[in-house]
């Protein structure tokens, strides 16, 4: 099915914690327009495609989105590891820290947990592909 390489698609090496920045980037992980939703969208919609090659393209895209998810998680992890209490308080990171410490949790920047309501899978190829283009900001 997949061949997982134990390395990131692009190396990420953040040396200094920055929980204030992590608060914003976490939305790309689990927010309404984030990589988690994108990967689930494509993996779910592939089954409504009438042609195997189109379903294969959606699987390829979903796999790429999962690679993005891994990179965003790595960024958040590196921005929040080894934080001091002073950094946590200064960044306003306490509410996240109370529930997740420095764990990477899928949520929007506003603190709302990931919700699958941000994606659609209608079982109709045209509807699903139109939703994909809208979600990715493409124009037809």
Where in this protein do the model-derived segments appear?
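Non-heme di-metal
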Residues: 1-140
């Amino acid at each position: 099915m997949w061949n997982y390489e134990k390395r990131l698609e692009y190396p990420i090496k953040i040396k200094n914690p920055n929980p204030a920045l992590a608060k914003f980037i976490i939305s790309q992980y689990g927010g309404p327009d984030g990589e988690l939703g994108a990967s689930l969208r494509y993996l779910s919609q592939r089954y409504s495609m009438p042609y195997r090659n189109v379903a294969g393209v959606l699987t390829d895209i979903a796999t790429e989105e999962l690679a993005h998810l891994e990179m965003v998680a790595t960024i958040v992890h590196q921005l929040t590891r080894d934080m001091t209490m002073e950094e946590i308080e200064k960044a306003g990171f306490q509410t996240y820290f109370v529930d997740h410490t420095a764990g990477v949790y899928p949520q929007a920047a506003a603190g709302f947990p990931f919700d699958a309501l941000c994606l659609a899978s209608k079982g109709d190829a045209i509807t699903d592909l139109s939703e994909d283009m809208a979600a990715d900001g493409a124009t037809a």
